């Protein structure tokens, strides 16, 4: 390994493979020494890099307003079909949920493209390395939160369109915390 050229960053998956190979080839003692050195290198270069995160690093979707507008039009058409008796309540509900899932997926796809192209953005570096965060969390940060669930597990058909960067309205904040409050209450009751 010492003589091998470093041609790309080491994501967590690659590091796991390297550690597994070293563990197979050497004893536990040598592996633990290597891991200590690897940890020290990680601390050293993460400090030297000076990577910081600011709100300017949070890329946003330029086509999100258009995606949301199209989704709202589609939901209006679905609701008109229901009011005319062309579809059942369950069909209406499922269709509306699917429209909002697709809208969030479109926003996520655009943000994934931005992430794939960005080599120096610290948020994307952490995400790509596997150190912190996933694309779904980044979508909530800069795209849209999407659909939330009721405490019983049923999905609320009104989406949280705003992202954390944009800021949530009072109603969106309430929707976002709906099932979290139930989870906290259940935990408190179970531990009491």
Q: Which residue stretches match the model-derived regions?
A:
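Feature marking long nucleic-acid-engaging regions of large polymerase/nuclease enzymes
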Residues: 1-89, 137-192
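Gly/Pro-rich turn-and-neighbor structural signature
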Residues: 90-142
